[in-house]
Amino acid sequence: MCPTVEPLVAEEVAVQIVLNSKFFRTLSVGDLAAKARALGFDGLDIIVRPGHPVNPDNVATALPAAVALWKKEGLVCPLATTPVTLVDPAAPEVEPLYAGCAAAGVPRVKIGFFPFKAGDDYWGLVEAARRTLAGFARVGERYGVQTVYQVHSGPVLGSNCAGLMHLLRGLDPRWVGAYPDLGHMVLDGEDYPMGLAMVRDSLSIVAVKDAYHAPQPAGSEPPFVPRFVKLGSGAVNWRRALGALKALGYDGAFSVHTEYDFDESIIRQVGYADATPPHLEEWAQADAAFLRRMWRES
């Protein structure tokens, strides 16, 4: 009788699921740690913007102190997210930001977006944006910190993975990385395996949200508009998206953006951090659990 042979099971790839802190601006860094843990997250994508506990005025010292505190709590901080208007590597706040990240051990910085207006010279804007990103790369190389650019639907460069690679192709991925957003991809993007294959060599971190095109009252133009919802309630095909990431060997972080019940008028305003979504903590906790389950099952 032949001995029973157990089938080989692939070892599960551990990933970090972190909470984007933009809707938690009133919390101290200590309270942010407690909140992230309570909601089931592994750490924080820390917002570095005016009015937040870590901000452009104090980032050089506040960020290292915050990350040291979070580390004691077993939490990670894989990303610092800046104002959506920060697109100049020579801006005075850039050096303290990158210095603070280097001192804190935060490996990457998300900068702002390059806007597009009807009538603009697209390829001229792309070339200008690439020069800007090369400038951020030089700053990042000095400090050992990568700059990432996020996919964001709407009138900005890099509104899908193809557009993002217009900006990134040929730049050193050690210092300029791709930050695909699974929710924005379902609105303006490509099929997940194809889009993620485009950014594979520059893939750094992944943004998580869900969205769909919601019907509007009869006679509205257009009759459907984008709306963000909790994970699993929108059009994102999670098994396909996460399966595509697994197929690429992705083992990095997911930043959960906790954007819920926002409609077209808000979504297309890039960086709308002043609006607080309903059911924030309840749905954020559900998002973390949903994403872990989908990652295991994909």
Segments and roles (model prediction):
Residues 3, 30-33, 69-73, 86-178, ...:
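Active-site acidic/histidine proton-transfer and metal-coordination neighborhood
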Residues 1-2, 7:
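N-terminal export leaders
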Residues 42-43, 76, 107, 146, ...:
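Residue-level detector of anion-binding/catalytic polar loops
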Residues 8-21, 25-40, 105, 161-176, ...:
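Histidine-acidic metal/acid-base catalytic patches
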Residues 45-67, 116-121:
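Glycine-rich, proline-tolerant flexible connector loops at the mouths of alpha/beta enzymes
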Residues 18-21, 79-81, 148-150, 179-181:
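Short catalytic-loop micro-motif centered on adjacent basic/acidic residues
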Residues 23-25, 48-50, 83-86, 113-117, ...:
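Active-site-proximal loop/turn and secondary-structure-junction residues that shape catalytic pockets
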Residues 45, 79, 110, 148, ...:
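Conserved beta-strand positions in the central sheet of alpha/beta enzyme cores
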